[in-house]
Design a protein with these regions (language model features):
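Alpha/beta-hydrolase superfamily serine-hydrolase fold, recognizing
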Residues: 5, 10-18, 22-243
Length: 243
């Protein structure tokens, strides 16, 4: 049976790849998992779907996670990987879910400081935009996946020696000017929803081309689940990338 992915080594970091490197689109997919959990079957299936349906070469790095590592080490490794993708001269997309979504939003701010080009598109599913969880109280009674207390402690570990409101870990507090066109999904029953809304408002205030899609009555990272609403979300992803 032919595998749906390959595993490569990039400067000591394992990277799963899907599709053909000569594809029209290149997607750097940062997986979620609260910065402590590894890539899972949902991510593998979604990356495979992206590669098959969108003429895309998809890379999903196994980046260093808390508590043994923090954001600084991951940013260094992902920066080198990103530089190699710029050289492919394809339609370049940063994509991620949950913590991975928060990472790429912070990363898009970071690369401006080192004069790297922005991607062509940014797409996130339920991004964690404020690891300080400063907009408390959060209503986590309706969220079947996430809880405030645990996330707050994980955020401190991921930040390492940084303040939890540093833009490298909490993109809500960073400079979003000149950010690439951005598509964001969130369910209105997840605890990240109100922080994501604040982030979207900040993008709009800075004239960033942003589209925010709310899943009514839905939950965290709903576009990655096998539900009808996820099919609609995928059509929006395809539209963002292909048009």
């Amino acid at each position: 049976m032919k595998s749906i992915f390959k595993s490569i080594d990039f400067n000591g970091m394992q990277v799963f790849t899907f599709g053909d490197k000569k594809s029209k689109n290149t997607i750097l997919f940062m997986h979620g998992g609260a910065y402590v959990n590894e890539i899972n079957y949902q991510h593998f299936l979604y990356c495979y779907l992206l590669s098959k349906k969108l003429d895309a070469y998809v890379l999903a790095p196994v980046y260093p996670l808390a508590p043994l590592h923090d954001v600084n080490e991951s940013i260094e490794k992902i920066t080198e990987l990103y530089k190699s993708l710029i050289d492919l001269n394809t339609n370049l997309i940063l994509m991620g879910d949950s913590a991975g979504g928060g990472f790429i939003l912070s990363f898009s701010q970071y690369i401006k400081t080192i004069n790297l080009t922005q991607p062509d598109h940014i797409i996130t599913f339920s991004p964690w935009v404020d690891i300080s969880m400063s907009n408390s109280p959060y209503n986590d009674e309706n969220d079947p996946i996430l809880g405030e207390i645990g996330l707050r402690e994980i955020g401190k570990s991921w930040a390492g020696n940084l303040d939890t409101k540093d833009y490298k870990v909490s993109p809500l507090f960073g400079d979003v000017a000149y950010q690439a066109p951005t598509l964001i999904f969130a369910g209105d029953n997840e605890i990240f929803y109100k922080d994501i809304k604040l982030y979207v408002e900040k993008l709009e205030e800075n004239d960033v081309n942003v589209k925010f899609i709310t899943g009514k009555g839905l939950f965290h990272i709903y576009p990655l689940f096998p539900i009808p609403e996820a099919k609609k979300a995928f059509k929006e992803v395809k539209k963002e990338i292909m048009e």
